[in-house]
Amino acid sequence: MSGLVYVLNGPNLNLLGKRQPHIYGHETLADVERDCRALGKELGLEIRFHQSNREYELIDWIHEARETAAGIVMNPAAFTHTSVAILDALNTFEGTVIEVHISNVHKREEFRHHSFVSKRADGVIAGFGTQGYLLGLRRVAKLLDEAKG
């Protein structure tokens, strides 16, 4: 299996650093991408980093990942709580799926406590800020190393 990992970001994450910084922090999505690529290089992972406000684009990237990727690290954002379609797409992916949330969704509004994505995710990281992405990449890399023996 390849060392390719898709890092997928859902709606409004293009506004990271500008939208509700008291919840999501001041780092931008470009900062997150830079950090993911740097860690990926260190861990021997190839990173494909995408963001979309459109559900179908995220689904298309999940379908694309089925053919080539070892893992998906995904912050589905608001689609976490609403998208059976993303869950169905993730259920077609055989690699590792790590769900990431910048904030601790369990300390927030009740509707944020439910995740369709968690029903497929191999792990969920919430409340660690943008470091959650890096933790997710480290987990995928560890599982790949263990699979190699």
Curated annotation (Swiss-Prot):
What does the subunit comment say?
Answer: Homododecamer.
**Does Amino-acid biosynthesis appear among the keywords?**
yes
Q: Which UniProt keyword terms apply here?
A: Amino-acid biosynthesis, Aromatic amino acid biosynthesis, Lyase
The pathway this protein participates in, as annotated, is: Metabolic intermediate biosynthesis; chorismate biosynthesis; chorismate from D-erythrose 4-phosphate and phosphoenolpyruvate: step 3/7
Family recorded in the similarity comment: Belongs to the type-II 3-dehydroquinase family.
Q: Which InterPro entries match?
A: DHquinase_II, DHquinase_II_CS, DHquinase_II_sf
Q: What does this protein do?
A: Catalyzes a trans-dehydration via an enolate intermediate.
Question: Per the UniProt entry, what is one GO biological process?
Answer: aromatic amino acid family biosynthetic process
Q: Tell me which residues are marked as the site Transition state stabilizer.
A: 19
Q: Which PROSITE patterns match?
A: DEHYDROQUINASE_II
What protein name applies here?
A: 3-dehydroquinate dehydratase 2
Q: What is its EC number?
A: 4.2.1.10
- GO terms, molecular function: 3-dehydroquinate dehydratase activity
